[in-house]
From Swiss-Prot:
It comes from the Eukaryota. Probable transcription factor that may function as a floral promoter operating upstream of known floral activators in the autonomous pathway. This is Agamous-like MADS-box protein AGL28. It is found in: Nucleus. Keywords: Coiled coil, DNA-binding, Nucleus, Transcription, Transcription regulation. GO terms for biological process: positive regulation of flower development; positive regulation of transcription by RNA polymerase II. InterPro entries: MEF2-like_N (IPR033896), TF_MADSbox (IPR002100), TF_MADSbox_sf (IPR036879). Disruption phenotype: No visible phenotype under normal growth conditions. Residues 91-168 form a coiled coil. It holds the Pfam family SRF-TF. The gene is AGL28.
């Protein structure tokens, strides 16, 4: 009689309940996985890192050329990628700040340029206005003629004020010095006659006395006297033509 078998059938993948079978299966499958990884490295010159943890928590690893080197390389890529993103964000922020600063500088430059143009225009207009006297009145338009008239009136007003100030100053000078009378010129030699008409309080005519020969009119010093003799005495002479003076 022929023996019957189950034949091929699909085995359901579930966790083994038998502890011994579990350990044996893990050991076989781990060795096979590491063997396949070694073949892949040999055939394709690939870099492989395999880490397996047993049901008890023990770790097993396989790597080519080195597990630690591959792990550091993989982690370094992640850190480098993060650093690259941070650098890009920082660069974008810096560029944005520089663009804002550039915009402000350009606005200030345009404002200064407008101010400069306005100043140059005002200087040109003032320079042209200062040459109004060089142009003939027939060459001026209505606005220029009106401006010229106002300037002439203002100039005339300033000149009149200056003339009035000078006239008032000269008038005060003459009023303050009206009491001063010029002394007569000195005459040397002979008798000096000062017969000029004078009147006293009663209206009677008087005449100045004749000075003796050698009498100095300017210092009233008779002939034969020197200045040393007059230093010890006070000489007071009243001339009828002038008020009382002390010499």
């Amino acid at each position: 009689m022929a023996r019957k078998n189950l034949g091929r059938r699909k085995i359901e993948l579930v966790k083994m309940t038998n502890e011994s079978n579990l350990q044996v299966t893990f050991s076989k499958r781990r060795s096979g996985l590491f063997k396949k990884g070694s073949e892949l490295c040999t055939l394709c010159d690939a870099e492989i890192a395999i880490i397996v943890f047993s049901p008890s928590g023990k770790a097993y690893s396989f790597g080519h050329p080195n597990v630690n080197k591959l792990l550091d390389h993989s982690l370094g890529r992640v850190i480098r990628h993060n650093n690259t993103n941070f650098a890009e964000s920082r660069t974008k922020l810096r560029i944005q700040m520089l663009n804002e600063s550039l915009t402000e500088v350009m606005a200030e430059k345009e404002k200064e340029q407008e101010t400069k143009q306005s100043i140059v225009q005002n200087e040109r207009e003032n320079k042209d206005a200062e040459k109004w006297w060089r142009n003939s009145p027939t060459e001026l338009n209505l606005a220029q003629s009106t401006s010229m008239k106002c300037d002439l009136e203002a100039l005339k007003k300033e000149v009149d004020e200056k003339v009035a100030q000078l006239h008032h100053r000269n008038l005060n000078f003459y009023v303050g010095s009206s009491s001063n009378v010029a002394a007569p010129a000195a005459v040397s030699g002979g008798n000096i006659s000062t017969n000029h008409g004078f009147f006293d309080q009663n209206g009677n005519s008087t005449s100045a006395p004749t000075l003796p020969f050698g009498f100095n009119v300017m210092n009233r010093t008779p002939a034969g006297y020197n200045s040393y003799q007059l230093q010890n005495q006070e000489v007071k002479q009243v001339h009828p033509q002038y008020w009382a003076r002390y010499y």
